[in-house]
Amino acid sequence: MIQAVTSCFQFKRCTTHLLEFIAADKPMVGDALADPSDEKLAHFVRTTAALKIEYRCAQGPSPRVFELALAQLRALNRIAEWESGWVVYPLYTCARQLVQMAAALDARTERAAEAAQCGDLATEDHLTQCGRAVHMSLNLCLKDRDPAASNKRHGAYYFALLLFRTYARLGAHSLVTNMVKVLESRAQDLPPVERAFGERRALTVTYCYYLGRYHACRRADYEKGFRWLNTALLTCHRDHTRHHQLILTYLVPVAFLARRWYPKHHVIAAWPPPQDPAAIHYAALVAALRSGDLGLYDRELVRMQLPLLRRGLYLPLSHLRPYILLRLVKAVWRLSGGSSQLPIRIIAAALAYSTSATPDAGGERLLDHTECLLANLIARGYVKGYLSHGNRVLVVSRTEPFPRLVRSETAA
């Protein structure tokens, strides 16, 4: 095996022999003591051999196994600095193994801390160390100045993908922001995502999913989030229904906020039954969005508050409220015969009824609150008209009081 591994570095090619040699759970074949002449490669070989032995003795990840896996990645980083693009996938395999070990160890530490009723100060330790090592791999790829097509720059996407996962588990949102800014600043030097991952479609899907989730939930850039999430959905294999559901959990609200697209009925119907209290189900929210039922919307938002906050979806879904209010105002306008003048008190009464509040509660304050909501709709361009505060009347355009903002279907 050692000879096959050294030949990979000699002839600049990635083979299954090298990938199996990197894997801690694969047995060593041959003499590990037959070190190659290159000092860096020899250190990598010895570290990997020690990792395999320790992994077999521990029968899985352990703190010592993690230390050796971390040393393995650092050793391969030093080698990769002078190699071309062929080394990206072996380096990614090594880094992915480290991330998986760190996540498993931190989860085990967290469970032990909960059982002992201790604090959780040490639960991020392995992932934090892991993140620093993987970030070094990312920098290696970004700093590759080789003009040839065989450079390592496409590897930046591979390690960004691992860092997305690592930072998500750590809750390190600022580190995600910094990483995305660096990738965007180097966009001209990097190949397109689809070309970078090649035939590894699963990696393309995961990368697009994380980037779309970041732009939608952390930056409130729904158009950019929609493009990445939609690419993830279209690239995902049609039989991977669980992945489809995970992507659609973000794409359904983002598609509406970005393009004003409702989800198709079969998309909502395909959602699993709502027995799981931690699951996110959109049937009621879509019904509220179509009917202008603010009360139903508020109840659903409260019911799903914790899972929405965990997934970062609370802010995007809270941005749906103006559209539901717009539906309500439009319904009042139709019931009033399509008049160009709508008394504020009628809209306030409909608003109070929809939210199960007492219609006359607050009196003038309720009317003032309703005017503020209507002024917001006018400022956003959702309603063409103006407010007559003295007469407490909403005056709307006779030709097009409510510009068409919503399409009936989505491409999802």
UniProtKB/Swiss-Prot annotation:
MF terms in GO: double-stranded DNA binding; RNA binding
A Gene Ontology biological process noted in the UniProt record is: mRNA splicing, via spliceosome
InterPro entries xrefs: Csn12-like (IPR045114), PCI_dom (IPR000717), WH-like_DNA-bd_sf (IPR036388)
Which Pfam families does the entry mention?
PCI
Query: Keyword Nucleus: yes or no?
Result: yes
Range of residues in the leader sequence: none
Write down the Gene3D superfamilies for this protein, in alphabetical order: Winged helix-like DNA-binding domain superfamily/Winged helix DNA-binding domain (1.10.10.10)
Q: Which UniProt keywords apply?
A: Cytoplasm, Nucleus, Signalosome
Major localization listed first in the record, in broad terms:
cytoplasm
List where in the cell it is found.
Cytoplasm; Nucleus
Checking SMART domains in the record gives: PAM
Q: Which residues cross the membrane?
A: none
GO cellular component: a single term: cytoplasm
Has keyword Membrane? no
Domain spans labelled PCI:
220-401
Q: Which domain of life is it from?
A: Eukaryota
Q: How does it assemble?
A: Component of a COP9 signalosome-like (CSN) complex.
This molecule's function is given as: Component of the COP9 signalosome (CSN) complex that acts as an regulator of the ubiquitin (Ubl) conjugation pathway by mediating the deneddylation of the cullin subunit of SCF-type E3 ubiquitin-protein ligase complexes. The CSN complex is involved in the regulation of the mating pheromone response.
Family membership:
Belongs to the CSN12 family.
What is the official name of this protein in its record? COP9 signalosome complex subunit 12
- Taxonomic source organism: Eremothecium gossypii (strain ATCC 10895 / CBS 109.51 / FGSC 9923 / NRRL Y-1056) (Yeast)
Task: Provide the gene name from the record.
Answer: CSN12
